[in-house]
Amino acid sequence: MIQMSTMTATSARSAGMTKDERFVILASSLGTVFEWYDFYLYGSLASIIGAQFFSAYPPATRDIFALLAFAAGFLVRPFGAIVFGRVGDIVGRKYTFLVTILIMGLSTFIVGLLPNAATIGIAAPSILIALRLLQGLALGGEYGGAATYVAEHSPQGKRGYYTSFIQTTATLGLFLSLIVILFTRTATGEQAFAEWGWRIPFLVSVLLLGISVWIRLRLNESPVFQRMKDEGKSSKAPLTEAFANWANAKIVLLALIGGTMGQGVVWYTGQFYALFFLQSILKVDGYTANLLIAWSL
């Protein structure tokens, strides 16, 4: 009997993905790739954005402000995870997905339309930073939400494998942003790209937003959440349950300080500061710098 149970469990784990499981992983991953694309465009174009929105300052100060604006989106991501994690626990994963992707896509599109500092003065960088904050909040909710959604569709013994696809989306989103930037630079030429062509990758995000919304609307609610809701077992105070318990809070702090924080420093230094350093310090032309980072991925 025990041997038969073991064989059954092994057979279930070795079975391939179902069509529905593949669609859940593809839809969740693709939408998250597009969100990373939106988030990383700023970092990939930080030197040009600094010249457009902080033009009143010397080059060194301009570069610092451009990096600080990029950091603003990064710093609010944990708050996005808290806010949208709570929303997801109350109203469901699917609708939270739609909210986060709409916030991210529209914020990115507006950056492409935003007048620079020479046109509207201090309002330009102020609005830019506000949009970066919205992007950070949206991404904070999206990334964890996507992993949770996929995990709740995963059969026993395959949760780590299924959610691992979500972990590839950050690199794919950065790569996609660099490819679009390289194509636009080639099509417009460097001078036109620095003047107005840099806006095109931001405006293109509205097309990706449309695709993402269409895909997300085809998804069903998470079966785990739906079952908890039907049985009246959904959490009424998810934040309190997660953080008021020291045993849970200790794990969160350990993961944040011991793992995620260090990983974030290494990743952003290796990709974005390297790109920024190539262009601003070593004076490598933008096309070559983008190409080098894209090849390194």
Predicted features along the sequence, with ranges:
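Extracytoplasmic gate region of multi-pass secondary transporters
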Residues: 42-43, 248-297
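Extracellular/periplasmic helix-loop-helix junction of adjacent transmembrane segments
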Residues: 46-79, 97, 122, 126
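C-terminal ends and interior cores of transmembrane alpha-helices
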Residues: 55, 102-121
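Central cavity-lining transmembrane alpha-helices of secondary-active solute carriers
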Residues: 67-86, 103-107, 172, 294-297
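Hydrophobic core of transmembrane alpha-helices in multi-pass small-molecule transporters
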Residues: 114, 120-140
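Glycine-rich segments within core transmembrane alpha-helices of 12-TM secondary carriers
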Residues: 138, 160-185, 208
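Flexible cytoplasmic inter-helical loops of multi-pass small-molecule transporters
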Residues: 217-239
